[in-house]
Structures are given as C-alpha cells and as structure tokens.
From Swiss-Prot:
Involved in the biosynthesis of the iron-molybdenum cofactor (FeMo-co or M-cluster) found in the dinitrogenase enzyme of the nitrogenase complex in nitrogen-fixing microorganisms. Catalyzes the crucial step of radical SAM-dependent carbide insertion that occurs concomitant with the insertion of a 9th sulfur and the rearrangement/coupling of two [4Fe-4S] clusters into a [8Fe-9S-C] cluster, the precursor to the M-cluster. The keyword Chloroplast does not apply. This is FeMo cofactor biosynthesis protein FixZ. It comes from Rhizobium leguminosarum. Its EC number is 4.-.-.-. The gene is fixZ. GO terms for molecular function: 4 iron, 4 sulfur cluster binding; lyase activity; metal ion binding.
Length: 465
C-alpha cells in the first residue's frame, strides 16, 4: 500500500526543494547544517528528548510544528510589556489569542490540527495568562491530549510564580519541557518590570512583589532540575531596564541547571496598549540583541530562532497557520488519522540521515583547504540544510562560521521580508543590512541586482546558490 501524501508547510512531500547545502561555496568553502543529529555539545540522551521539539532544538524547528492551546487566560502577575488580549487576530506577540478555548474545545482543535499538520509534535499551554496559575484548565487539556495522542509531547510556558506548587504533577504527566520567563534576579530591577503579583490570595506590589516572584522562580527552576525536566528560560531584553542585568540572570539560571536561555527583544508599540508601549519604552536594536546573545554564548545553550509566538500559535515557527483552524470550522467529531504523521516521521528520519552525511562531507572539504581565518556566512533557507529561500522572502537567515574547525551554526539573524511589492523596500533593506553586520557571504536561492549591489557596498558578498 502506498504511503499517504505528505504536505510540509509550503513545500511538497520531498520535504525541501533543493539538494543539501553542497560542500562548495564562493571561495571554495562549504556550508552545511548543524544539529541534525547528536551534536558535539549535546549527548545522545538529551538529543532524543529534544530532537522533535522546535523550541528546544534549532534543527527541529525546520521539521516540526507546535500548537499552543489558549486555555489558560487567568494570570497572577502584571508585566509592563504585556496586555493580554483574547480576541485579537492581528498582533503577533505572546499573550495574544483570537479566542479563549475550553479544554474540550482545545482537544477538538488539537485533533483537527494533528490530522492535517503531520509536522505537529508538541502541544503547549502558553497562556494567554499563566499555565500554572490557571492549572485546572491546563491539566484537563493535557489529560485529553495524552489520552488521544499518547506520543505527543506536552509542555508549558509560565512566569514561574505558581510553578513550585505543580512540579510533581508536571513530572507525573510526563511533561518533559518547561519554559519560565525570568527577566531579573534583583527585585529592584524587577519592580520596574512587574507592578504587581497575586500570591497566596494576596496582592503585592513594588519590590516586595518582585522579591517573591524571584524566590519562586528560582525554587521552581531548582525543583524542575531535580526532577530531570528540561527547562528553557525566556528573558525579555528591555533597554535601560534589564539589558545589562541579563548577564547576571544568565549566571543564576546556569547555576541552577537550566538547559537553555532564550533572550528575546521587547515588543513595544503604543497600539499594543502595554505600559511600556504607552510610555515610549524603546525596543532593542538588532545589533544590541546580538551583542548580548554573543556575550552569553558559551555559558549555556542559547536559543536564537525564537519567533515570540502568540498564545494560540499553530504550525512551524515563522509560518503560523492558526487562521486555518477556526473553531467554528472544525467538526464536532474529529477522526484523528495517524498514518500521515507516521509517514512524515519516516521522511524526516531519512532527511536527517542525508543531512548528516552532507555535513560530514562539507566539513572534510573545508578542512582540506588549509586556509586560516573564519568566514561568517548567512544562508536564506526554508530548512533541511538547503539553500532554498529567496532573499526577499526570508524572515530569518542562518549564520554559519566556516573555518578549519569545520562548519558550525552560530546563530540566526532576524530580518524583515524585502519583497513587499515596492512598499517600504529601502527601509527594510536598511534594517537587513544592520542585521548582517559582520557577515562575509550571503547565500540564497535568488537575489535581485539592487540588494546584491547594496550588500556589496557594505562588504557582504551575495550569491545565488
């Protein structure tokens, strides 16, 4: 019997539409994918736990999708960068959802998505409030998913205030991945970020509130580490508030066993209705974010591919499909078909084998050149270790360091799409040029003469692969 046809995001069942990055680039150098198998800094046991999780593995986010079930609207803290919205379809940032779901509605939606999105590997509760504070709804949702799709990964995102009360239950439910947002370890700084919290049926403000939050976050992280649960720490970079302080946050979480640190830029616009947005708090520039990430690199694994997802996000990172699954368009009885999901997993396994072979060949080719120095190479890719994205359509670029040590993925550069029908192209390209500071070579499937010339003027050699 033939295997079912698989649709992969915007690509076909071939997964990706070009051959793996070949061991040749301008100047005779090579490019390859990194992290497609057991990497140098992750042992085999950890790799097995993260290889299908798009947020905990950079390699996985090209193959696997996540779904956030927006079942937890209640929250126990107020953040100056957050305005929880439950009926918003336009904004793309955390704490925003188009509709609140009951656990039963969420399960129906999960089954519908899993039937049509074979890449789906993770169901998370990330709000729009707090998963641990709105605990009964979170648990009811996870129990339903575990019953219907036993091999689906479950994870939560939390501010950490109520987390210590539920670590044992998380472990009992086989939840292996938890994200905590930690923006400070100094209550004086925390008071500038959090105006109030609710804890023990009491409302606290100012430094007292931030002090309680800090203690609970550290306790929760320590308890998760003791239970062997992988923890990712999200930190919002707020210029002039906690930007330099995040170095200290990084040290604290590393010492308490966090697996990964994800530093994301503040999203702050007046239209969002947040305190920071209304008071004019600026967002960090791309070069400021990169400088901070580079400063932290080496202390702990860094996530550099975060898309700062909505509380109801569905699909591959950067390719949200939530609007395809409006609740009123989903049948009251959904038949979940596992065949497409199983076939897709086989394709990914084969693809990863090809990528590992290509990586080994490319590293050999680079080392045989014998030249010294390191090249920084940015690649426009839809994933799979292939140069298959038009420069003007790219939302992010993978950055590789190419040297005698081999080819290693060192980060991501978030960029805006350049091809917008002639609207704002110059401003967008200016932003991209800033993001490409320090890059020697840009590889894409196609690039126009105008952006190629502008990049050349800044010292970036652009090539159509």
């Amino acid at each position: 019997m033939s295997e079912p046809e698989i649709k992969v995001g915007k690509t076909s069942s071939a997964l990706f539409d070009r051959a793996p990055m070949a061991p040749s680039m301008p100047g005779g150098r090579a490019s390859s994918s990194h992290g497609l198998s057991v990497t140098d800094d992750i042992d085999a046991r950890i790799w097995e736990r993260i290889k299908d999780h798009p947020c905990f593995s950079e390699x996985a986010h090209h193959y696997f999708a996540r779904m956030h079930x927006x079942v937890a609207p209640a929250c126990n803290i107020q953040c100056n960068y957050c305005n929880r919205k439950y009926d918003c379809t336009n904004e793309s940032c955390p704490x925003v959802a188009s509709v609140k779901l009951t656990p039963d509605q969420a399960l129906r939606k999960v089954l519908a998505v899993a039937s049509k999105v074979p890449e789906l590997s993770v169901i998370x509760v990330a709000g729009p409030g707090d998963a641990c504070y709105d605990w009964r709804k979170t648990v009811a949702t996870f129990e339903g998913v575990a019953r219907e799709i036993p091999d689906m990964k479950l994870c939560i995102s939390t501010n950490g205030l109520a987390l210590p009360d539920h670590v044992d239950e998380l472990a009992d439910m086989n939840i292996d991945h938890v994200t905590i947002t930690i923006n400070m370890v100094d209550p004086e700084i925390g008071a500038k970020i959090y105006p109030w919290i609710i804890h023990g049926h009491r409302r606290y403000t100012g430094i007292a509130a931030a002090g309680i939050l800090h203690e609970r976050q550290m306790l929760g992280l320590e308890l998760l580490t003791k239970r062997g649960i992988l923890t990712k720490i999200n930190s919002v970079m707020i210029p002039g508030v906690n930007d330099t302080h995040l170095v200290e946050v990084n040290r604290w979480i590393r010492d308490r066993g966090a697996f990964m640190h994800n530093v994301v830029p503040l999203i702050s616009k007046p239209s969002h209705g947040t305190y920071y947005g209304l008071t004019g708090q600026r967002c960090p520039e791309p070069f400021e974010l990169k400088a901070l990430q580079d400063c932290l690199d080496g202390n702990i694994k860094l996530m550099r591919h975060c898309q700062q997802c909505r509380a109801d996000a569905i699909g591959l990172l950067g390719d949200d499909r939530e609007r395809e699954f409006a609740l009123d368009q989903i049948s009251t009885k959904v038949e979940f078909d596992t065949s497409k999901r199983e076939a897709y997993r086989k394709l990914v396994q084969h693809e990863r084998g090809d990528q590992l072979a290509a990586k080994l060949d490319a590293n050999k080719a680079v080392k045989s050149l014998g030249s010294s120095g390191t090249l920084a190479v940015a690649v426009a890719t839809k994933g799979g270790g292939r140069i298959n994205e038009h420069f003007g359509q790219a939302r992010e670029l993978q950055v590789y360091a190419v040297s005698l040590k081999g080819i290693n993925l060192v980060g991501h550069x978030x960029v805006e799409q350049y091809c917008l029908g002639g609207i704002g192209e110059k401003a967008t390209l200016d932003h991209t040029i800033v993001a490409l500071d320090g890059i020697d070579i840009l590889l894409s499937s196609k690039i126009g003469d105008c952006p190629k010339k502008r990049l050349a003027e800044t010292g970036v050699r652009a090539s159509d692969a």
